[in-house]
Design a protein with these regions (language model features):
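N-terminal active-site segment of His-dependent metallophosphoesterases
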Residues: 1-66, 106, 164
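Active-site-proximal beta-strand elements of phosphoester/diester hydrolases
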Residues: 2-14, 115-125, 154-157, 209-215, ...
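Active-site neighborhood of phospho(di)ester-bond hydrolases with catalytic His/Asp-centered motifs
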Residues: 6-8, 48-54, 78-84, 122, ...
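Active-site environment of divalent metal-dependent phosphoester hydrolases
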Residues: 12-15, 57-62, 84-92, 126-129, ...
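Short glycine-enriched, charge-decorated loop/helix-capping segments at active-site entrances
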Residues: 18-24, 97, 127, 166-173, ...
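His/acidic metal-ligating clusters that form di-metal
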Residues: 32-49, 130-210, 239-242, 250, ...
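Extended active-site neighborhood of metal-dependent phosphoesterases/phosphodiesterases
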Residues: 61-142, 179-189, 215, 230-244
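Acidic, His/Gly-rich catalytic cores of divalent-metal-dependent hydrolytic chemistry
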Residues: 208-209, 213-265
Length: 265
């Protein structure tokens, strides 16, 4: 059994700055890490952590230092992809010592695990809130799929390859979706797609595969389907996702806070 934890949209700011003058994102991330420590005896060995973008809110070197100082207390191999708030070059520099990130170009990578393959895709368009699966990323994924020969894949990118229904988030969504879907359709193995960006857990079918977006440790966006919905965030510590392989993928949301109980019934 292979277990990967997905953490997304931590939005760490340099020097402890409050994000939007509201959110102590470093403190919220510390609470999430403490929760992971709390449940480790319950879930067993965790093989890897995937941070699915927007590790930083401001793309600064110091914000990545803070992120690493917090996550390293877990002593679990951690793999990262950039989101729209990240700096590709500074993210690369911060995690280059781990050896899986390419030295130049997009931060697309592949790591084999015991029961499945973990692939990270770079959807960042520098300076833009929306994302893109460009031709180089499509070629990278196509080549990997051909080499993996239908083996199961946990595939991560920051921007969801589907519409959320939240208008102001869909306006800064993913470009190149049609070509991305075509590559996915060509793969005969099981793919579990995981992403971030929309700060909500959502589940969709994308090109015949299950796709999930992760909650965020500090904030969420109201699921308001109206065109005139207010643009803004809700303060809520909404947890993370656990993905495991046991004769197929299973994905579970785990809250940052334990709650009361368990009580007998």
């Amino acid at each position: 059994m292979t277990i990967v934890l997905q953490i997304s949209d931590t939005h760490i700011a340099a020097h402890g700055r409050l994000v939007s003058d509201q959110l102590d994102t470093a403190s919220a991330f510390e609470s999430l890490v403490k929760r992971i420590i709390q449940i480790r005896s319950e879930i067993g060995k965790v093989d890897a952590i995937i941070a699915s973008g927007d590790l930083s809110d401001d793309g600064t070197t110091n914000s990545y230092e803070i992120f690493k100082n917090i996550i390293e207390t877990l002593d679990i191999p951690t793999f990262v992809i950039p989101g729209n708030h990240d700096s590709r070059s500074r993210l690369r520099d911060a995690f280059s010592v781990d050896g899986y990130l390419p030295k130049v170009g997009k931060l697309n990578w592949h790591v084999p695990l015991a029961d499945f393959h973990l692939i990270g895709l770079d959807s960042l368009v520098e300076g833009m809130p929306g994302g893109e699966v460009d031709t180089s990323t499509l070629a990278f994924l196509s080549d990997k799929f051909e080499a993996l020969d239908s083996a199961p894949v946990l595939l991560a990118l920051h921007h969801p390859p589907f519409k959320s229904g939240i208008k102001f988030m869909d306006e800064i969504g993913l470009q190149g979706v049609r070509h991305f879907h075509n590559v996915l359709k060509s793969y005969n193995g099981e793919v579990r797609l995981i992403c971030g960006h929309i700060h909500n857990l959502m589940v969709m079918n994308v090109a015949g595969h299950v796709a999930l977006s992760a909650p965020a440790p500090t904030s969420s966006f109201s699921y308001n389907l109206q065109d005139n919905a207010l643009k803004g965030f809700m303060r809520i510590e909404d947890g993370f996702l656990l993905h495991r392989w046991s004769n197929g993928f299973q994905s579970v949301r785990i809250s940052t806070h334990k709650g009361e109980g368990p009580f007998p019934f």
